[in-house]
Regions:
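Ferredoxin-type iron-sulfur electron-transfer modules and their immediate structural context
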Residues: 1-215, 219-220
Length: 220
């Protein structure tokens, strides 16, 4: 990995080996103890084969003898920036407030800091993995270059424990894995298809009217 040789155990993935050796491969969908999905595409790495190079998801690709892996090649960075941009572009992610296609990265940062106290900013501003990756790879969202109005989705507030704002969801699937594989409550799952996809409770109802026991595993 990145020019260094590492030992691995049968059953480990590339991401497992990297994390065990303090090599940072960013990821948004992987949750330890659950099945890898590769849904976010942020953990992709470049794998050298005898016939050339290819991109693979490190969270779902088994480690093998003789693998040559690059985690931050120019091609990898380009792809990560693209996927992060798509996620920022897909919902109401106000960490890229004021961004535009022709705005410099420095100007964007200054404008974002000036807007930091605005009420419409995301409640987890400054404590968000997606935002951290956007800053790390200098992604402002709006991949198409066109301004898109924030997604308007009713906020689910009918219970005192968990408030659900699906306009912030990037469909990483961590909450689904936590509910179905760690707690085995089977209260939430992926629903609908394409750009209408979202995390649903029961038969499309609210958490309050589903089999959710409000253990909090999905939030953690």
């Amino acid at each position: 990995i990145n020019g260094h040789v590492y030992q691995f155990r049968p059953g480990q993935t590339i991401l497992d080996v990297a994390q065990e050796n303090n090599i940072d491969i960013p990821n948004l969908c992987h949750l330890k103890g659950t099945r890898a999905t590769g849904a976010c595409r942020v953990c992709i790495v470049e794998l050298e084969e005898s016939w050339g190079k290819k991109l693979v998801s490190s969270c779902s690709s088994p480690a093998k003898n003789g693998m040559i892996v690059h985690t931050e090649s120019p091609k990898i960075v380009e792809y990560r920036r693209f996927y992060i941009g798509l996620m920022l572009d897909s919902g109401n992610h106000n960490c890229d407030i004021g961004a535009s296609a022709d705005e410099s990265w420095t100007d964007f940062q200054i404008e974002a800091m000036e807007n930091e106290q605005k009420e419409e900013l995301c409640p987890v501003w400054g404590d968000c993995e997606l935002q951290a990756l956007a800053y790390r790879y200098q992604v402002k969202g709006r991949v198409s270059g066109r301004h898109r109005e924030p997604v308007k989705v009713p906020i689910e507030t009918d219970n005192p424990f968990i408030v659900r704002d699906m306009s912030r969801c990037i469909l990483c699937g961590r909450c689904v894995a936590a509910c179905n594989e760690l707690q085995v409550n089977q209260a939430i799952d992926f629903g609908f298809r394409g750009d209408k996809g979202k995390i649903t409770a029961g038969t499309g109802t609210t958490l309050m009217n589903s089999s959710c026991v409000f253990c909090g595993e999905c939030v953690q």
